[in-house]
Amino acid sequence: MAGHSKWANIKHRKGAQDAKRGKIFTRLIKEITVSARMGGGDAATNPRLRSAITAARAQNLPKDTMDKAIKRGTGELEGVNYEEVRFEGYGPGGVAIIVDCLTDNNNRTVADVRHIFNKYGGNMGTHGCVAFMFDKKGQIMFDAEGINEDAIIEAALEAGAEDVVHEGDSFEVLTDPNDFSDVLEALATAGFATPSEAEVVMRPQNLQQLDEQQASTMLKLYEKLEENEDVQNIYANFDISDEIMETLSA
């Protein structure tokens, strides 16, 4: 069942950098708040909130912080009213990009995201123009060091996962979105309790290989989107060879 997912590995490394900047906590808090606002504060009856809490626990977000985020969503505490916005478009080399945002000022966010696309060789498209190139999946990432491949594959499949992908220094466990929380909990029970990342994502069906120039520009576009305070998640279907990544990292 093991395969390869270069994009997941790139995203995994970038996710580690993101965590160091602390943005990931802000992103998780906003998702919990919006989930509670849309579906209520009971995770047992609100699947989106349950997934958000599961992802937050995987990143060690304090329980008190989660509880306050839920209360802001249900109106028990005062908070910002965020609107969900999804942008779709293309980057260098025809890369398909989805950008999910939570914003308190839609006009500002539209202008900011469009500016980033235009500045770094991309262009915004219409709703639905690239979403069909992605599948919604639960994604649980583990650092590969110290993990037996056969053991994690067996545990994941027994837990109800769809696939396990080994790429570089990480394992990626894929699930149906509805099974995400159950699989994560079952993996923890089986001894795999410390994922580096766990969330429901839009996973590309195929990857677009980029040359060095395209890769350089695409990574700049990605990083600028990532730095925007309204951006929650970025999904893209690009692939960069190890050789080009080494050159760009030098």
UniProtKB/Swiss-Prot annotation:
One of its GO terms (cellular component) is cytosol. Keywords: Cytoplasm, DNA-binding, Transcription, Transcription regulation. It is found in: Cytoplasm. SUPFAM superfamilies: YebC-like. The keyword Protease does not apply. Its main location: cytoplasm. This is Probable transcriptional regulatory protein Mmc1_0479.
